């Protein structure tokens, strides 16, 4: 069974738990959680991830800055990124995708939609 390493970046403990719980349905999943973009960058420096899932609106460093920094880092620029933000935050969605995010999931999160997007990305990665 292949192993899939996910980095979940979300400042809300409840949302982090919900996303992580959904990802655990994928066989071989290993989930690491981060509270904000700075915490995520620290974890990226010591671990390898298959997909980053990040909220956009967070304190300290938001998800858009995180997407930009990951895309400009040669060691991590190819890691797929899924941005998660409040439904209707069209400007955030557009900016996130323009910065290099691979996909977008609106809040409130529908588990089936999240898993479909994650599985599509994993299939493309091979």
What residues fall within each predicted segment?
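Receiver (REC) domain active-site loop signature in two-component systems and cognate sites
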Residues: 58
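C-terminal output helix
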Residues: 109-118
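Two-component/phosphorelay signaling modules centered on CheY-like receiver
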Residues: 13-32
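Active-site T/S-Asp motif of two-component receiver
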Residues: 53-55
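Acidic, metal-coordinating helix/loop segments flanking the phosphotransfer/catalytic sites
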Residues: 33-51
């Amino acid at each position: 069974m292949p192993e899939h390493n996910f980095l979940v970046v979300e400042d809300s403990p409840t949302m982090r738990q919900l996303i992580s719980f959904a990802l655990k349905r994928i066989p071989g999943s290993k989930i690491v959680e981060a509270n904000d973009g700075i915490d995520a960058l620290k974890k990226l420096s010591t671990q390898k991830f298959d997909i980053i899932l990040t909220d956009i609106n967070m304190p300290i460093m938001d998800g858009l800055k995180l997407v930009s920094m990951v895309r400009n880092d040669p060691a991590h620029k190819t890691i797929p990124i899924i941005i998660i933000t409040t439904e209707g935050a069209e400007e955030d969605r557009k900016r996130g995708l323009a910065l290099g995010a691979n996909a977008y999931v609106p809040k409130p999160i529908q588990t089936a939609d999240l898993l479909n997007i994650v599985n599509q990305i994993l299939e493309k990665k091979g």
